[in-house]
Design a protein with these regions (language model features):
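Conserved ABC transporter NBD signature motif
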Residues: 60-74
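Helix-to-loop junction immediately C-terminal to a conserved catalytic motif
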Residues: 52
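H-loop/switch region of ABC-family ATPase nucleotide-binding domains
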Residues: 198-199
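Catalytic Walker B motif of ABC-type/P-loop ATPase nucleotide-binding domains
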Residues: 162-165
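Conserved catalytic motifs of ABC-family nucleotide-binding domains
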Residues: 158
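H-loop (His-switch) and adjacent beta-strand-loop-beta switch element
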Residues: 209-223
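Conserved ABC ATPase "signature" region
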Residues: 115-133
Length: 239
């Protein structure tokens, strides 16, 4: 299977002698749906940023589709939803405007969108079941619906890799389940590689093919069914 992400012997520290990650080996094949979990401060967000080339490792190598991640030439094919705790300047933006901005950014477009671009925006909104509120400001929507809108923004760019960092922050349990089911459907329909990053993995566990637990290094990598029973207790993972 061709690799979308490869980390080999990766280490990283913000200061000399203080490692956030060390000896990380991770390979994610094209088309996989993988969850990365671990305690806050355990290095999972740093791992993702290294994988995407947003930071460079102190040691080892990080590759995206076979290229050095920090020099990846097809960055517009990546959909990255960074951890977000509030809407900020997005509050008055409508769903359609947000998704259109994603299409414009991915296509490097300036000025009015072409017909095909408008179609992709509408398709992305429909895929996340927000067509009925496409012209509503984000601030009027629930947390779960807001997160769907940001997923649609990423989808409008036709990504080959979709990365979500803590997508369920501030979202209730029912919306977490709904979001996980949506990602599973998108994975099946589009064949996109999905990397789901969270300190909790319960909502997505039954949908992913692999679960990767990170606590400074990778302490588990395999199917959720192979996870030792004690690890299903979040207090154990977060210890």
């Amino acid at each position: 299977m061709p690799l979308a992400v490869e980390l080999a012997g990766v280490a990283f520290g913000y200061r000399p002698g203080q490692r956030v990650l060390e000896d990380v080996d991770l390979r994610i094949g094209e088309g996989e749906f993988v969850a990365v979990a671990g305690p806050n401060g355990g290095g999972k967000t740093t791992l993702v940023r290294l994988a995407l080339g947003l930071q460079r490792p102190s040691g080892g190598r990080a590759l995206l589709y076979g290229e050095a991640a920090h020099r990846f030439s097809r960055r517009r094919t990546l959909g990255y939803l960074a951890q977000r705790t509030e809407l900020g300047g997005y509050a008055p933006t409508t769903v359609r405007e947000l998704v259109a901005a994603g299409r414009l950014a991915a296509g490097g477009l300036i000025g009015p969108m072409r017909r095909r671009d408008r179609e992709l925006v509408s398709e992305a909104i429909e895929r996340v079941a927000l067509a009925d509120v496409a012209d509503a400001p984000l601030r009027t929507l629930s947390g779960g619906m807001q997160q769907r809108a940001f997923i649609a923004k990423a989808l409008a760019g036709e990504p080959s890799l979709l990365v979500l960092d803590e997508p369920t922050t501030g979202v209730d349990a029912e919306s977490q389940e709904s979001l996980a089911a949506l990602l599973d459907r998108l994975h099946s329909e589009l064949g996109v590689t999905i990397l789901y990053v969270s300190h909790e993995f319960g909502a997505v566990e039954r949908f992913v093919e692999r679960l990767v637990l990170v606590r400074r290094t990778i302490i588990f990598d395999g199917p959720p069914s192979a996870l030792p029973g004690v690890w299903h207790d979040p207090s154990h993972v977060h210890a």
